[in-house]
Each structure stands twice: as C-alpha cells, then as structure tokens.
C-alpha cells in the first residue's frame, strides 16, 4: 500500500490552474471514479489521469456508463510500480488478464456447470468471477465466518482499510451463492 495520501498532488494542481488558461490534468492516487468526479466538479482539474486504476480495471468507462461495480486499485504497487522500477512486465494483482487482453479472453462456456470454489479469498473470488462470466452457476465455500481470507489481516492498519473496501466490492459484484 502506498503511504502517499490520496489525491496528493491536488494542491499543486490548484496553483497551476490559477495561473494558466489551458486545461489542467491531475494524477496522484485518484483511485475511484467518485474521487475523480468530485475533483472535476470542484474545478480543481479539468482532466483526471487514471494510471494504476486502468491496470486494475481497463473497462472503467463502460462500467460507469452501465452502473457496474469497478475493481479499484489497492495501491499495493505489486506488479505495476515495482515492475517499472525493476524493468519487468507490468501486471496487477487484481487483474490476471492485464497485459494479455488481446490474447486472453473469458469465453462463454458451451456447457454450463455448477462450480464449487473452496475459499473466499481474493483468489477464490477471482476464480468465481471468471466462472460466473463464463456462464456457470457458482457456489463459494468458506470455512470461517468471514469472507476475505488474508485480506482481513491486511486491512487492519488504518491506511490499508482500502483492502477491505475493495474486497466488499468484489464479493458484491456477481450473484454468487
């Protein structure tokens, strides 16, 4: 998780906007559509640059238009910032298809099945998402009384609460029993 505050560059953006007459863009942990909309409505910036958010969910614009849930960036920096710094292939822990969109397609199945997923961690729910998108009926089994697996531990520090918020978005994104 990043230790830099959300929307951290807005102060500088406001200063630039006050002295120029051209459109001004902002970046810097603007990780949700709601945060971006507020910045635009307040007039702080004219354009929002979603970087890592688009690695997590490249279909944000269509999902906003259709009222669908969006996978939000955790700001964990694994696969994106870490990869850039070590000159590796870009990826995202929440988007297995990232970087392979033109070669990996979630195809509808020819025969629907009842699919059982054991464990409701991020990985389990990710598998459930793919099975559901293929057309299967999905049931997730979890032995504890809380869904999320290790995300429950990860989200304890205050700056990591985003993990739990994201997990709740994921578990409510698809009709999974």
Description of each model-found segment:
Residues 1-118, 122-138, 146:
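Flavin-dependent oxidoreductase catalytic cores
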Residues 117-176:
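Beta1-alpha1 glycine-rich phosphate/pyrophosphate-binding loop at the start
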């Amino acid at each position: 998780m990043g230790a830099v505050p959300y929307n951290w560059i807005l102060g500088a953006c406001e200063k630039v906007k006050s002295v120029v007459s051209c459109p001004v863009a902002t970046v810097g942990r603007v990780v949700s559509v709601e945060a971006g909309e507020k910045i635009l409505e307040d007039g702080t910036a004219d354009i929002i640059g979603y970087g890592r958010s688009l690695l997590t969910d490249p279909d944000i614009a269509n999902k906003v238009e259709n009222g669908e849930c969006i996978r939000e960036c955790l700001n964990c920096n694994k696969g994106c910032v870490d990869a850039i710094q070590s000159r590796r292939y870009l990826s995202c822990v929440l988007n297995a298809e990232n970087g392979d969109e033109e070669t990996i397609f979630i195809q509808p199945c020819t025969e629907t099945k009842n699919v059982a997923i054991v464990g409701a961690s991020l990985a389990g729910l990710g598998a459930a998402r793919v099975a559901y998108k293929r057309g299967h009926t999905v049931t997730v089994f979890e032995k504890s009384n809380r869904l999320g697996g290790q995300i429950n531990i990860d989200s304890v520090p205050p700056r990591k609460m985003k993990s739990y918020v994201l997990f709740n978005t994921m578990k409510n994104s698809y009709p999974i029993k």
